[in-house]
Design a protein with these regions (language model features):
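Extracellular "leader-to-stem" segments immediately downstream of a signal peptide or signal-anchor
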Residues: 7, 11-104, 108-198, 205, ...
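Surface-exposed extracellular loop regions of Gram-negative outer-membrane beta-barrel proteins
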Residues: 220-228
Length: 228
């Protein structure tokens, strides 16, 4: 309370700004963005090695799960020292993917990753949701405990999340009737679009993220991350 009182007295003692000629949309001076040079990802994965997920069995067919094939390509790329994982143009159905250190998952123009609508396609593990550490389904794309990893390209990650929102609103109606409004946020497990957790030097750039079933992009316990 002493700190708060001191802060109030200090703020009240400050001279008032002259706002005689103030106009909305204008600021008296340009903000200092020099701090931005010291944040964000400091390095990108090496692009000299290219691994095609199609060569591991990924199929441009929105009715066939390509999760395992894409993950095998990511793992192989990581084991070889890192590089870029690519996909031929088309629509790919996938569950949870885990991008590893030194790997760039490239979602190129003409490529659409379509998220599986079955929640069982997303393994559960301990994470943090709305301030509480708890077990929760993986995101569609996950970067967990990694360094120098990225997702890039001009393609699309379509999370098709309506099924999870329908579930949430139905449960919320039931919970509100019982006076349990806030609990539904934790009881109704949904799939995030992208999760970056306990990682460093991560870059997410240029692709389109749409129709997520829960949060679009969560950056948790991580540093030097760029979302562009």
């Amino acid at each position: 309370s002493l700190l708060l009182s001191g802060a109030l007295l200090f703020s009240c003692a400050q001279p008032r700004l002259n706002i005689d000629n103030f106009e909305w949309g204008k600021i008296p001076q340009q903000p200092d963005f020099s701090w931005a040079e010291n944040v964000g990802s400091r390095q990108l994965p090496d692009s000299s090695t290219v691994v095609s997920a199609n060569s591991f069995g990924a199929v441009a067919d929105s009715t066939v799960l390509s999760t395992d094939a894409i993950q095998k390509a990511i793992d192989s790329c990581a084991l070889s020292g890192g590089g870029t994982v690519t996909l031929q143009p088309g629509y790919y159905l996938t569950g949870a993917l885990f991008v590893k250190s030194g790997v760039n998952l490239q979602i190129s123009k003409g490529v659409t990753l379509i998220a599986c609508s079955d929640i069982h396609c997303y393994p559960e593990f301990r994470s943090r949701i709305a301030g509480i550490e708890m077990v929760w389904p993986a995101a569609v794309i996950n970067i967990i405990g990694e360094e120098k990893a990225s997702v890039s390209g001009e393609g699309t990650l379509d999370c098709r999340g309506k099924i999870f929102w329908d579930k949430y609103w139905a449960m919320r109606k039931e919970y509100e009737a019982k006076g349990l409004r806030w609990i539904v946020d934790y009881d109704c497990k949904r799939v995030r679009g992208i999760l970056v957790e306990n990682s460093s030097d991560v870059t997410l750039s240029n692709f389109t993220l749409m129709r997520t079933g829960f949060w679009g992009c969560q950056i948790l316990y991580s540093d030097h991350c760029t979302v562009d």
